[in-house]
Every structure is written in C-alpha cells, then in structure tokens.
C-alpha cells in the first residue's frame, strides 16, 4: 500500500500498520475505510510539520520521543472510527459500562455522534490488544477533544474534520490554516464544530464549553475573529 510506504516509520512499524490495515479492511465499509486512510494521510502531513520536523534540533532522545509519538498517532488514526462498525445500542452499553473512565455524564451518552469514540477506544483496545493509554485516549476523544490536548491529539482531532474527503464551506481555509498554525487551526475547527452542532439543533457534549474556554485561554489571542 502506497500510503503505508509514505509513512515516516521503521519497517517493523510499517508492518504493524499494514496488519491493522488488513484487519480494518475486513470490517469497515468503503466510506469508513476511505475516511480512515484520508485521516491518516492528513495526520501524516501535519505530523511532518509539528512533530517530526521539530525534533532534529532537540537531540537524539527527543527524536526518538517524536518518532514514538508519531507511531502512536498513526495507530490511533487507523482505529479512530473502529467503533462505527457497531450499532448505537452496543456502543452505548459499552460506554455506560466504562463511564467511570470517561470524561462524560450519562446524558452525554445520548449523543449518538460521540459514542463511537467513547466506546470505540475500549473495543479497539480489546480487539487489537492495545494497552497504551495515549493511543486509547486519542481514539476516545477524537470527536470532542479535551482540555490541554497533546500535539498528537490536536492533530487527530483536526485531521478527522478537515481530511481531503471532507467538503463544507470553511474546509479549504481550515486546511490552509492547519499547515501554518496548528493552535489557531484548533481554535477555528472547534469553533466551526460548535456552530455546526447549534445550527443542527443537536445536543452539546457537557464538556464542550470548558474545552472551548481552555482553547481560548491559550490561543484566543491568535485570532482576529471570523475570516471572510
């Protein structure tokens, strides 16, 4: 697979991603699979700028750390929508069973669009024998985010929403912004998502505005408001 060969990984790591790819191919529908690979590809693009290209001047230890962060990001991207292969009742049951390990309320579990992340992390962990907390956290919160997100989780949150298969009014501008300033892009993508939810008359995740305030606290000064 060309997309695997393009990843900045060791041969052993590429083989691991290749194995994940073969397994998800068996269970994802064509739309889910295309979105997964497109999300991974956009993660690769952003990671090159914000993870891999940042490491050479920081010493060998930090280069190794950056490569490890990047590998975990690739795994999370491959599995971020694993929960979508299950029906909502199953997802809700798994999420409710594990609610003590989620930053959510029982009411949040009535929001269908976030269940696949919350429950999918536990299901992917079990199915693919993934015990790494950072990978599972990336999967768990890729739809909603959390306060003080890591660079990898900023990347997967953004990539999921602006990968090349997405088509909505602001997406081209957001892609351009993502290559220039990841933090300002996070602010704009999060804002765009809140506006979409409100305009759709849908319930909002209980932590949304705390997360929004946290993003604004650090990055709000970077923005001049809406760009036309």
Placement of each model-derived feature along the sequence:
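Acidic/His-rich, divalent-metal-binding segments that scaffold phosphate/diphosphate chemistry
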Residues: 1-104
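Divalent metal-dependent catalytic cores for phosphoryl transfer on phosphate-bearing substrates
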Residues: 24-26, 68-188
């Amino acid at each position: 697979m060309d997309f695997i060969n393009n990843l900045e990984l060791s041969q052993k790591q590429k083989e691991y991603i290749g194995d994940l790819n073969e397994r998800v191919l068996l269970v994802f529908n064509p739309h889910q699979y295309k979105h997964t690979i497109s999300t991974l590809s956009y993660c690769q693009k952003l990671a090159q700028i914000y993870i891999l290209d940042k490491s050479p001047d920081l010493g060998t230890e930090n280069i190794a750390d950056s490569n490890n962060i990047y590998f975990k990001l690739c795994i999370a991207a491959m599995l971020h929508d694993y929960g979508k292969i299950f029906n909502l009742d199953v997802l809700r049951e798994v999420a409710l069973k594990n609610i003590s390990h989620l930053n959510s309320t029982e009411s949040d579990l009535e929001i269908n669009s976030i269940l696949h992340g919350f429950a999918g992390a536990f299901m992917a962990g079990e199915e693919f024998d993934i015990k790494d907390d950072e990978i599972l956290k990336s999967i768990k919160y890729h739809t909603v985010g959390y306060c003080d997100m890591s660079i990898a989780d900023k990347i997967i949150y953004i990539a999921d929403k602006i990968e090349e298969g997405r088509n909505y009014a602001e997406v081209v501008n957001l892609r351009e912004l993502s290559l220039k300033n990841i933090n300002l892009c996070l602010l704009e993508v999060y804002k765009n998502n809140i506006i979409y939810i409100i305009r759709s008359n849908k319930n909002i995740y209980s932590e949304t505005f705390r997360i929004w305030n946290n993003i604004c606290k650090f990055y709000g000064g970077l923005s001049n408001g809406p760009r036309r």
